[in-house]
């Protein structure tokens, strides 16, 4: 078993309040398995977000999705197990708003076989072409040393639901810089 104790988030907000307008916690796990029917998609991305904080902090260029991305945040804000999924996932499995998927996370402890922590279900509330912090494609070397493109899939869920399903977990802190400040400060 592994144990994680959450640091005091207020300490970060106090230390960064001069240089950042907004801060938010983001659970980012690129080792999530998405399950649809009998199929599994390993190495998918799960983002656990607080919708209000995330909307105030992150940015996304207009015109990349059918609607403004705030509408997608609003769609999961009132559905505790609501999820936003990437359009490539929806296309691969012919998924629509209202359908359900399951996503699994694994223990960070190194073992011979991955140990699944939990596998909650989520109700699809929105489908997006683009999302802050998500790259649909990664590039890696195969066994022969050739660089190959690998497609990834996204699930965005409510932060509180992710924590209730998987327990406390390390998170990233995302910030939006205040006017007149840069990332090197």
Task: Show which residues each predicted segment covers.
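Short aromatic-glycine motifs in intrinsically disordered, low-complexity regions
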Residues: 105-116
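Short, conserved charged micro-motifs
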Residues: 4-10, 181-185
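A short beta-strand structural signal in non-transmembrane regions
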Residues: 90, 163-185
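A cross-kingdom feature strongest in bacterial/archaeal respiratory oxidoreductases
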Residues: 133, 137-140
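Short proline/glycine-enriched turn/loop segments at secondary-structure junctions
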Residues: 36, 112-113, 163
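Short beta-strand boundary microenvironments
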Residues: 7-105, 119-130, 142-146, 150-154, ...
